[in-house]
Each structure stands twice: as structure tokens, then as C-alpha cells.
Amino acid sequence: RDFQFHTDQIINHGYLSVDFFFMLSGFVIGYAYDDRWEKMNLWNFCKRRLVRLQPMVVMGMLLGGILFYFQGSEIFPNLAQTPVWKMLLVMTVGFTLLPVPVSLDVRGWSEMHPLNGPAWSLFFEYVANILYAMLIRKFTSRWLAVLVFLAGCALIHQCYTQGNNIGGWTLDAEQCRVGLTRLMFPFFGGLLLFRLCKPGRIRHGFWWCS
């Protein structure tokens, strides 16, 4: 039955892609910035990340606001009674990627970004970027490996005790714990992979990847 449920999903699938996204982000951060800190300060790093990520955030929230009242469904119980001013407030806050409290839930799913649900992962992406820039970039590969090991243990414990690895999109203590646990191992594991693996060249790599 569960198998049939998942095979019937054409678009809404690939749940673990979020965790892969975190690992890929960690690898890319290491590739793009690990060797630049002698010529770059914290403010330069933040500007680069904002320029890269924030336009996508604003566009996602804007589209979510425009299409908000067209997604009427019984799975979104709060949508019909949400006034326009409240939706606009949530959209405006969403432009900054700051999470909204449960009191501003406009869909009924207690999301920190109800106009663009997946944006919770970008919020944690920013958290990881800040941790990297302020502290973890200074770790040696050995200490980074220790951090990744501990984060992996925390992730295993969460999966074992919770029974799954679902959560991270609500602004409360429990969901933030789940989100941070989901973030730490793959993101800094990706950074560690970059530091341990020497980049190589593949002939005609562009065409193979295409």
C-alpha cells in the first residue's frame, strides 16, 4: 500500500532531496569560499550569499502570494478565512526569509513560510552559512570530521527515536531541533567531502553532464 502511494505521486516526491540539497550546498560552499578568506571578510561573504539566494526567495514568496487564493483545498483549512492584509503581511515578512510564528499561519499547516513551504530549507541554509562563516570555516579537517561524526550520531538518534526524519518547517522548539539535526550532518558532511576529495577533470565533462 505504501509503495502504491509513492508510485502514484508524479510531482510531490523525492523527500530526501532536501537532505541531499544540504550536502550539495556544503560541498559548494567549501569549493567556492574555503580558499578565499585571506581576501574576503564576513561582510563580503554575506553579500555574496544574499545576492545568490535572496532573489529566488523574493520571487518564490511573490508567486506564493499571487497564487495564494487559487489553491483552495480541504488540505489548507485556514486559506478561505485568511484576510488579504494577513496574507500580504506574511508575504512581506517572507521576503526577508525570517520565519513567521504559528499565529500567522495562513494555510493551516503551521509552516514558518506558508506562502512557499520549501523555503524552510533555505532558512536553515542561511543558518548553516552563518555557522560556517563565523566559526566552522576555521576548523581543521580533523575537527570538522569530529563535528560531522557527532552530527551523524544525533541524526541517527533522531531517526531511531522519532521513527523518521520528517520536520523542520515550523517555528517551535521541537521542529527547530529537528531542522538543525537534519541540517548539520549533510551540510558539514558536504564541506568535509570537499576538503578530503581532490578536484579532478573529466574530458568532455560538460557533455557527459548534459
Regions found by a protein language model. Give the residues of each.
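Alpha-helical transmembrane segments and their helix-entry boundary regions
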Residues: 44-45, 53, 121, 144-146
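Membrane-interface helix-loop-helix regions
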Residues: 6, 53-126, 154-163
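Alpha-helical membrane-protein architecture signal
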Residues: 42-47, 88, 116, 127, ...
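Functionally critical transmembrane alpha-helices in membrane proteins and complexes, commonly lining
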Residues: 1-35, 51-58, 181
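Non-cytosolic membrane-interface motifs at loop->transmembrane helix junctions
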Residues: 5-12, 78-82, 170-179
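Interfacial transmembrane-helix boundary/kink motif in multi-pass membrane proteins
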Residues: 43-53, 79-88, 204-210
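Membrane-helix interface linkers and caps
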Residues: 29-49, 72-80
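Specific transmembrane alpha-helix
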Residues: 17-34, 121-137, 146-205, 210
